[in-house]
């Protein structure tokens, strides 16, 4: 995104297409993490290969691990055989020692560290790793890819992806290993967590299954003229028969492109950063890019059923413009007080007041020269960035607080180089990071 000034802000990501469920990130960023520290800066030399022991997935346990990383399948190198189509899950302790296991490739899949343990999945299995070992759960319906994971206070884990009929699918995994699967066909839109449930925002053009119920609900609510298209908040899990439950409805707004529902509800209120297109008609005719517009907040109050659109303005009171290269796709977001704080995939950090829409550009994280951008995670206090030095296959974890103080290097290590890059006469490929997660309560000495 970029304020209405001469100085552009870099965010080379895309918001999902209006017809897509959630924006896909295409080629993920390269990098992986290895050791951790007890001081603000730790430089560890390249660990021997024995520092990481390879095990079967069902033999993993958390032990002293503080960091978990999921590596993608190998990326192709011209003139060499096809790279391996699998993923690595790596667990590392504060000294760079750890465990690694190979599982089947599942594009877009995340590792998620919860109070229950570490959650990750393959196309046909789900895993939960704890201090006692790994629970391996068979998945009845095979997954081709994954979009997001969510954790509930009662220990349940929800996995979101695409359904068999180009719709939305959610698997809810109970602590005893039971899996409840919900599929909503022909439905798209941003999806997120709201209390004990998974909800989404869609409309009657993007979801045929809600069409009749949505128009009926709007007619009962308004009593006025019927719009051509009705927007709705729906509950994805626990549907009402074959139709998702409607939580709120409102007239659809032409050219309103939802972003990423990356922050849970605040009570009964859902706030979603979105884009209002400059010229929806020109977008439909192919003359304008669908991401050209301004940033707004779409705010739904489920207790009243009302929707409000709040313009997002920079510190000079000007709209924040979006385009193909500067938008909301893939941002990492967290709520801190009355603000959404987020970092783009190029390291630009912002704060937006969820009530007024006033925005602040906090900082831009300087990045070393790498083949691909860093991978980010956010906490209430700041941003963690994971970067790889392409020449040396060295990995760096850094931290920058939201309130300033500059970028702090937390660790640098080469212990994972053999998992990142394979170079020999018969095979050459590079892996990228699908995701990484820090153990709850561990900050690497950042505070």
Please report, for each region that a protein language model flagged, where it lies by residue.
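Bacterial N-terminal signal peptides that target proteins for export
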Residues: 4-33
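C-terminal hydrophobic structural anchor segments
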Residues: 372-396
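Short beta-strand elements that form the blades of beta-propeller/WD-repeat-like
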Residues: 59-82, 110-123, 151-164, 190-221, ...
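A detector of low-complexity, intrinsically disordered, Ser/Thr/Gly/Pro/Ala-rich segments
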Residues: 3, 11, 20, 149, ...
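Repeated scaffold domains used in trafficking and secretory/extracellular systems
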Residues: 53-58, 104-116, 142-154, 184-197, ...
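N-terminal "mature head" segments of proteins
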Residues: 2-3, 31-166, 170, 428-447
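Surface-exposed loop/turn elements that mediate protein-protein interactions on large endomembrane-trafficking
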Residues: 48, 78-106, 122-144, 163-186, ...
């Amino acid at each position: 995104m970029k304020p209405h000034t001469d100085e552009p802000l870099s965010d080379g990501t895309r918001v999902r297409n209006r017809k897509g469920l959630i924006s896909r990130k295409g080629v993920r960023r390269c990098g992986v993490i290895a050791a951790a520290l007890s001081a603000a800066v730790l430089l560890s030399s390249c660990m021997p290969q024995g520092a990481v022991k390879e095990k079967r997935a069902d033999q993993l346990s958390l032990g002293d691990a503080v960091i978990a990383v999921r590596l993608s399948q190998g990326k192709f190198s011209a003139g060499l055989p096809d790279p391996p189509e699998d993923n690595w899950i790596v667990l590392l302790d504060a000294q760079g020692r750890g465990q690694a296991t190979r599982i089947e490739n599942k594009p877009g899949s995340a590792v998620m560290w919860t109070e229950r343990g570490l959650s990750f999945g393959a196309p046909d299995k789900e895993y939960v790793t704890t201090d006692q070992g790994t629970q391996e759960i068979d998945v009845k319906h095979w997954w081709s890819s994954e979009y997001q994971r969510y954790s509930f206070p009662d220990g349940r884990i929800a996995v979101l992806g695409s359904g068999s009929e180009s719709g939305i699918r959610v698997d809810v995994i109970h602590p005893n290993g039971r899996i409840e699967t919900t599929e909503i066909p022909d439905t798209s839109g941003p999806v997120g967590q709201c209390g004990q449930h998974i909800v989404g925002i869609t409309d009657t053009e993007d979801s045929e299954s809600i069409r009749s119920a949505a128009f009926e609900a709007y007619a009962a609510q308004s009593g006025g003229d019927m719009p051509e298209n009705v927007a709705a908040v729906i509950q994805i899990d626990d549907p009402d028969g074959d139709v998702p439950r409607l939580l709120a409805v409102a007239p659809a707004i032409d050219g309103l492109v939802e972003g990423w529902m990356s922050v849970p509800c605040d009570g009964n209120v859902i706030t979603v950063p979105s884009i209002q297109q400059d010229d929806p008609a020109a977008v439909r005719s192919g003359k304008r890019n669908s991401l050209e517009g301004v940033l707004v907040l779409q705010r739904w109050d489920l207790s009243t059923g009302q929707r409000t659109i709040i313009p997002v303005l920079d510190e000079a009171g000007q709209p924040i413009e979006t385009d193909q290269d500067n938008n909301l796709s893939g941002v990492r977001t967290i709520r801190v007080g009355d603000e959404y704080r987020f970092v783009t995939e190029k390291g630009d950090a912002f704060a937006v007041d969820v009530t007024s829409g006033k925005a602040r550009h906090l900082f831009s994280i300087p990045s070393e020269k790498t083949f691909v951008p860093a991978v980010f995670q956010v906490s209430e206090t700041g941003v963690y960035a994971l970067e790889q030095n392409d020449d040396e296959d060295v990995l760096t974890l850094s931290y920058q607080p939201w309130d300033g103080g500059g970028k702090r290097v937390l660790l640098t290590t080469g212990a994972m180089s053999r998992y990142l890059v394979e170079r020999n006469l018969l095979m050459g490929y590079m892996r990228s990071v699908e995701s990484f997660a820090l153990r709850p309560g561990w900050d690497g000495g950042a505070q």
